[in-house]
Curated annotation (Swiss-Prot):
Family: Belongs to the SprT family.
Keyword entries, A-Z: Cytoplasm, Metal-binding, Zinc
Taxonomy of the source species: Bacteria, Pseudomonadati, Pseudomonadota, Gammaproteobacteria, Enterobacterales
SprT-like domain sequence ranges: 20-162
Binding of Zn(2+), residues: H78, H82
Name recorded for this polypeptide: Protein SprT
Catalytic-site annotation from UniProt: E79
Coiled coil: none
Molecular-function GO terms, alphabetical: zinc ion binding
Length: 165
């Protein structure tokens, strides 16, 4: 388990939650799925990722430190569910009906696709864009795609194309 200056108490809480939910899933599914590898190497605005082939969960140490309780309650089971779905059903839609079932019926956790954590500390440079109704901040990656002509982004509220300020 790789660490990134995380207090041992937080690492232990993550492991407790992971083992608790894994045991719960194994009991409900009548299986004996192994404990996944766990690392704290996720970067950027993603709270975590599940790597199917290596059976690994990567967690974002910055977001974990800033949102410990909610992170442990929500993100750890979320990523575990991806691995369990892959083991149980094979390759399916990432947040499809199998994942939702695993989250709600097996793990007993609300099936939320995205986190609501404050991202200021992990967000890199953004670029201002406008539509009819508001200003938007595009990431460097999205901005570069617009500049290269590879993408066009629209406002989810008014449907207008976003234009650089």
């Amino acid at each position: 388990m790789k660490t990134s200056r995380l207090p041992i108490a937080i690492q232990q809480a993550v492991m407790r939650r992971l083992r608790e939910k894994l045991a719960q899933a194994n009991l409900k599914l009548g299986r004996n799925y192994p404990e996944p590898k766990l690392s704290y190497t996720q970067r950027g605005t993603s709270a975590g990722t599940a790597w199917l082939e290596s059976y690994e969960i990567r967690l974002n140490p910055v977001l974990l430190l800033e949102n410990s309780e909610a992170f442990i309650e929500e993100v750890v089971p979320h990523e575990l569910a991806h691995l369990l779905v892959w083991k149980h059903f094979g390759r399916v839609a990432p947040h499809g009906k199998e994942w939702k079932w695993m989250m709600e019926s097996v793990l007993g956790v609300p099936a939320r696709r995205t986190h609501q954590f404050e991202l200021q500390s992990v967000r890199r440079n953004t670029f201002p864009y406008r539509c009819k109704c508001q200003e938007h901040q595009l990431t460097v990656r999205r901005h570069n795609r617009v500049v290269r002509g590879e993408a066009v982004y629209r406002c989810v509220h008014c449907g207008e194309q976003l234009i650089a300020k």
